[in-house]
Structures are given as structure tokens and as C-alpha cells.
Amino acid sequence: MRILLAAAECAPMIKVGGMGDVVGSLPPSLIKLGHDVRVIIPGYSKLWNLLEVSSEPVFRANTMGNDFSVYEAKHPIHNYVIYLVGHPTFDSGHIYGGEDEDWRFTFFASATAEFSWNCWKPQVLHCHDWHTGMIPVWMHQDPEVSTVFTIHNLKYQGPWRWKLEKMTWCPWYMHGDHTMAAAMLYADRVNAVSPTYADEIKTHEYGESLEGLLNYISGKLRGILNGIDLNEWDPDKDKVLPAQFNIKNLESRLENKIILQKEMGLEVNSKKYLLGMVSRLVDQKGVDLVLQVSRRLLAYTDSQIAILGTGDRSLESGLWQLALDYPGRFSVFLTYDDSLSRLIYGGSDAFLMPSRFEPCGISQLLAMRYGSIPIVRRVGGLVDTVLPHDPENNSGTGFCFDRFEPIDFYTALVRSWEAFRHKDSWKSLQLRAMSQEFSWQRSALEYESMYKDVCGIKAPSPDIAEIEKFSYGQSADPSLKTM
């Protein structure tokens, strides 16, 4: 099949969140299955310094009253084709934000549609998040191109209908309330990035006011778990780590722990229980829970906590105060550092992910791969990837809690600390976690199956009368038919 992935990010060149990992890492696994897979992204100015870009465009056209050009490049690691949509709107230096963000990504979506019709025509056009949400609307009229839309984070939904009408001249019934709704209505298949998240977003608690629409389209909705690049993330070959290790020489991992303690200003003692966290410091990630339980945990146990990330100023301030109050036991680096993040994965004893919601989550997969035991809230992709530790049956890969409450999180932390004191059992837990298989090849087989199901097939056009029922804020109604 000819498959084109359209997105705002593609790792490693352009990456803000998990979407960049998916778009960068999924194509090579699909190519191994025999498909012609390419990616199209906005032509951010920095890319011309990071990639070898064709001197002449492969396509020129005009859309939304603006001329644009499409250039060809190759992925720097995997060597597949990447198309860059060139226009001055992408020269600002930032990926997200800015006063023209809505217009910028709607223009990118329109340019991608023009390119797909008139230059390189895919059989499947795979769109990612609201930035590409209008593509399924425009491609719906083409019987030769099937569209797939992936929801990475339902919270971000794109420009509203009045702005879309002004920018695209499409009447409201062609896109519903916003670009996220547009994509879900017109895409031939829709998937979320984990099976549990696909179920959760059909409920009021996690539906972000789109649960009614998601129940309506549930017949074409599924969940496919993200993966990780096992070659890029391999503790046995990771040159960033002071000491490489695998399941056969786990003892070497202690050297990483000692160096992590030194680098983050913690007391150097390999027997201390060291909790790590690499995260955006925002409410979604449960940082407020960390703030609420840390003092009690440090008072009751001999634990240490090492946190790396940036985000909300108030959360950063709270973490900084804890570091001042508990020198040698609590450390926070308010930045992002790839080398230090790898050291936290490869040196901490356990890894914190007390998320409010988590569409899939990559960090828990990396933590397990590197022998750091995840402590997670049972939500979204964390349910699908972390199995609760059961010492009696010698099973499980992490510690889990259900409610987003400090006492529940604290209880899970204490259980993990107590388990850490039993070295043989803890080592068995580490070995089980490190043996889990979350490769992109597994995910690629599921995406391939979905592509085959949809290739050459168009979902029925949405019923305008039904669309009217799903204005913003509409609750789910299980009696409604599904597409």
C-alpha cells in the first residue's frame, strides 16, 4: 500500500510530545512489512539545517489564497521520504502557539490535500491530531484515498466552527464544532493510542465534551497501543549511560544509580530507594499529587526523589521548595536533558507516573525497558502496559492505584518501598519489566490490519441531522446509532 502520514511533528527533528515519536518511528516498521510509507509535515525553518532537502520543490500549488511549495527530504535515521510544506507561516521558529496557529495548521491540512490529489497520491492518508483534522473532510470526496485519524490527546481540539468557516469557506455541517470533530466525523477509521483510552473517551469523565460524538462513531473507533524503538532505547547499547546493562548483568545498573545521585545532588548511597520522574510538569501528569505526598513519604521512609522536566510555574515552584527543604533527598532539574533523562530511566529504582489521564504514555515503557519499576495510576495506556505487582504469585511489572487521590498514590509508594527491601523479589520484578515487548513492529501489524480494512472503502457521509446533536457539551447517549 501507498501510505502517507500527515502530522505537525516527526521525531527526532521535530518533537514536542508522543505524537512525534509515533510519526517518526512507525514508518520504518510499516516499510519492513512491504509498504511504501512517506511522511508530510510543515516545512519549519530549522529543518533546512537538519535535513538534506531537495533544491527544487517537487510540487507547487495555491490553496486558501496562498502559494506553497513541497520539498522532498529523507529521514536522518531511517531514510524514508519526508515531504516539507514550504510557506513563510512556518518560518516563525515555533511549532505550536502564536496568533496564527489555527490558520497555520488549517493551511497545512489544505496543502496536504492538494499534494495528495495532484502529486503523490496515497491509498491511505493517516492524519494525526487536530492539526490535520480537515484533511479527512476534504479527502472524503475522493474514492481512491481512504483516511485514518489518530487521536493522541483529545483535550486539544483545534479552531471552532466560526473560524473554520471563515478560513476554509466550508459550511459548518462539513466539520461540526472544530477540527477534531471534523476528523472524527469524516475519517474512514479513527483510533486512539491505547485500547483503554479508546474506551475512556466515550465517557463523560474523559470525553472532553465529545463523548456523544465518540459514541456515535464508535463503530469505526479502535485503540492501538504505541510502541518504542528498541534499537534507540536499549540499555545494553546506550552509550549515554555510564554503565550498560541487560537482564543478565543487572548488577551493573547500580553504577548508574550512584552517578545519578551525584549528578542530581542526592546522598550517594546505593541502598536508598530512588524514585525518578521525567515529565512535563503539568496537572495532567499528576505533579500536584507528587507535591502532596512527598513530605510524608520522605518523613516515613528513607526514599530519594529525582525529577526532570519543565512546565507550569506554580508546580515548578512547589518542587523547587521541596528541593530546598530536603537537600540530598529531593532534587529537581527544571529543564529537559536527554542524557539526564536516560540516566534517570537507567539509574532510578522506580518511576513515577500518577497521571490524571494518559492516552498512551511512553515513559513507563522506557522505564520498564531500563529496569525502573513504574508506579502508575490505572488510567489510559497505563492500564494496558503496566501489570500490578503480585508478590504471592511472583507476577506483575509495576505498582498501580485507581483513584486520583493523595492517599491512594501514597499507599502505592509505600507498597513499592516495602517491596524494594526484598532484594530477590525486587530483582525478579525488574526482570519481568525488562522482558516486556512493546516494539513498533507489534504496533505496525495492528495499523497494517486497520489500513487493509479501510483501503478502498469510504465511510458513509455523516447525517447532518445527527451532527446537530453533537454540539459542544453534548453528553453520550447509548441509544444513538453508530457509524
Swiss-Prot record:
Its EC number is 2.4.1.21. GO terms for molecular function: alpha-1,4-glucan glucosyltransferase (ADP-glucose donor) activity; alpha-1,4-glucan glucosyltransferase (UDP-glucose donor) activity. It catalyses: [(1->4)-alpha-D-glucosyl](n) + ADP-alpha-D-glucose = [(1->4)-alpha-D-glucosyl](n+1) + ADP + H(+). ADP-alpha-D-glucose binds at K15. CDD domains: GT5_Glycogen_synthase_DULL1-like. InterPro entries: Glyco_trans_1 (IPR001296), GS/SS (IPR011835), Starch_synth_cat_dom (IPR013534). GO terms for biological process: glycogen biosynthetic process. Pathway: Glycan biosynthesis; glycogen biosynthesis. Keywords: Glycogen biosynthesis, Glycosyltransferase, Transferase. Coiled coil: none annotated. Belongs to the glycosyltransferase 1 family. Bacterial/plant glycogen synthase subfamily. Synthesizes alpha-1,4-glucan chains using ADP-glucose. This is Glycogen synthase. The gene is glgA.
